[in-house]
Amino acid sequence: MQLTVLENLKKENVEIYLEYLNSCKSSNWETWETTYKTYCNNFKLFLVWFQNSYKNRLLLSKDTLLEMPSIMENYRNYCRSLGNSKRTLMNKTTAISTFYAWCVRRNKIKYHPFSEKLDRLRFTEKDKVKNSYFLTTEQILTVRLYMQVESKKYDLQDRILWELFLDSACRISAIQNLKMEQLDLENGYFKDVKEKEGYIVNAFFFQKCKELIKEWIQYRTENGIDVNWFFVTKYGKIYKQMTQGAIRNRIRKLGMILGIEDLYPHSLRKTAINLINNLAGLGLASSYANHSSSGVTSKHYIAKANPTEI
């Protein structure tokens, strides 16, 4: 997990947070690159804001702990001014709260500074629902063919992301963390893919995706892209792992082909699982989704009588 962003922050705050991360890693190895990666990123955002807003304050100083409820309210307001949803705000608050809970357990502080002291975020039905789209086969083919024709607007990674999300039904965290060494091109899958809750699965892909991956491998060779991450972004002259934000932006761009302004990778996952259910039944769909029970699949991943379908 890269922590270079922390280098310019107050040393004492960084040290205690790194100690916390190391502790988490020892007991949560399976989810270190998924759940705790999100916690880490959320806490880094808070640390940057905290230093900019409160200068040389220490995270565990007496005055900081006393003022923490007000500090958290200020941070909430800051996040809302950036357009963060209530759900995102809750996740960011949780990342900070778990850090302070750990500090209490390790006797670094005597009490949690804002537990049960903040007003609860009130969620309406509008807050709870993010638009989900169950795409049709026609829509899937439309995007595929449009990218093929408009090859200057959409690169190989756009095309592979589209096919791979729909073929594998994997979550964005799993797709983002794919590495070249996991690829079994001949047999059509990435092996040892880490999914939510520590599940280790194979991410399968089919013929069209296989052809695009062959092109991508050739392109990487010709252009000297010698990094292990499968999906990459160029920063200056250096290729690095593509971020989840960049992947979301690419999928959102592809959604615009269909006139959908808020298409997310999770809608592609839902589409894939829904299509499998229609073809082969709920049991196989649930298994392919790596769900612990078919109830989760049925409730959240299968198109109802009147789905949002364009």
Whereabouts are the PLM-identified features?
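C-terminal catalytic core of tyrosine-transesterase DNA break-rejoin enzymes
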Residues: 163, 167, 269-291
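Short, polar N-cap/turn motifs at the start of nucleic acid-interacting alpha helices
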Residues: 183-185, 261-262, 279-300
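Basic, Lys/Arg- and aromatic-enriched nucleic-acid-binding interface segment
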Residues: 137-172
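C-terminal catalytic core of Y-nucleophile DNA break-rejoin enzymes
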Residues: 195-215, 227-250
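Conserved tyrosine-mediated DNA breakage-rejoining catalytic core shared by Y-recombinases
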Residues: 168, 172-173, 177-211
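DNA breakage-rejoining catalytic core of tyrosine-based enzymes
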Residues: 124-142, 197-208, 224-228
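Catalytic-site neighborhood detector that most strongly recognizes the C-terminal catalytic loop/helix
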Residues: 194-196, 289-310
